[in-house]
Amino acid sequence: MDMKRRIHLELRNRTPAAVRELVLDNCKSNDGKIEGLTAEFVNLEFLSLINVGLISVSNLPKLPKLKKLELSDNRICGGLDMLAEKLPNLTHLNLSGNKLKDISTLEPLKKLECLKSLDLFNCEVTNLNDYRESVFKLLPQLTYLDGYDREDREAPDSDAEVDGVDEEEDDEEGEDEDKEEDEDGEEEEFDDEEDDDEDEDVEGEEDEDEVSGEEEEFGHDGEVDEDDEDEDEDEDEDEEEEESGKGEKRKRETDDEGEDD
């Protein structure tokens, strides 16, 4: 697939200005030049042209926001001055696997003031004596050359773009944790409500027991009252019998007195 068609497919019905990343690896470039890429990609930040048969970058449009450019496994042997002219904010440049032989071919990169990382793996220039010292001296703005700084300390795996992605992932995890904490809080509140309901049930049962106790006590009092009434009735009957007995006794005494007369 040629480069023009690949760019058309990568757009996916978007306008060039809406594209921030463009990967054209392994497509075919006619005459070893960039084709189909225009200055309309004003917001492009990442461009990958790995193994597309490039010989020159002379057709590269001006991309003011481009930060990372992948040009590994091509046949570029010079003409890097176009990079400084067209890509003023470039920070990462990968030229591994190209035909760069001399330190002098890298001189145009001095104008890339924002350049922090340069990769030249598998280029003949890396075989020169004092290669690393010479490149760092030529390009003092560099922080990392072939993945290591001046003190041979390895570069971190993540660059600014990857860090941004990591921050988004951390935010999502934080939201999930907050959501889990909220759910736990809701469960605790629900448990507290259940405990309150149980306490209310226990109190209700105790109240019922108290009422039942009062009823029983009242019932016993009623029984005691009935017994008292029975005793009172018995006493009344006894008094009546005694009075009847006394009346009969008086009557007999009166009758006896009459007979004596």
Curated annotation (Swiss-Prot):
An annotated GO BP: regulation of apoptotic process
Residue ranges constituting the LRRCT domain according to the UniProt record: 123-161
Post-translational modification: Some Glu residues are glycylated by TTLL8; a modification that generates a side chains of glycine on the gamma-carboxyl groups of specific glutamate residues. Directly cleaved by caspase-3/CASP3.
Keyword entries, A-Z: Acetylation, Chaperone, Leucine-rich repeat, Nucleus, Phosphoprotein, Repeat
A Pfam match: LRR_9
In-chain residues carrying the UniProt-annotated modification Phosphoserine: 158
Motif (Nuclear localization signal): 249-252
Assigned protein family: Belongs to the ANP32 family.
Comment block on domains: Histone binding is mediated by the concave surface of the LRR region.
Protein name per its UniProtKB record: Acidic leucine-rich nuclear phosphoprotein 32 family member B
Organism: Bos taurus (Bovine)
